[in-house]
């Protein structure tokens, strides 16, 4: 992790320090950090632990396009959207099947897998950025 912070994450830390409003998280896997091959965009270790907690980012986190093979090869649109939100992502970009992703999130909230408070956290971050524009 120290090597990652000292090298690959330097531009992200600088962006955070300079007040970036958005960060796009790609689908690269970092098994040395996360312990598995989960894409960074779906990993709570990468989104919440590293980006939000270690780097101190409080803005909007958006996924890279969710219709890419790194996601669609393993996850349904619904599972990918739910997993990304659970990881700490605020906005889902281009799911392969929008209706399925939307319904998956709605079902996860209705079933308690994702709390309404979690959704409200994302909404608040998005509104805060919009008001700054």
Q: Where are each of the predicted segments found?
A:
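Second-shell residues forming the walls of enzyme active-site clefts
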Residues: 1-118, 125
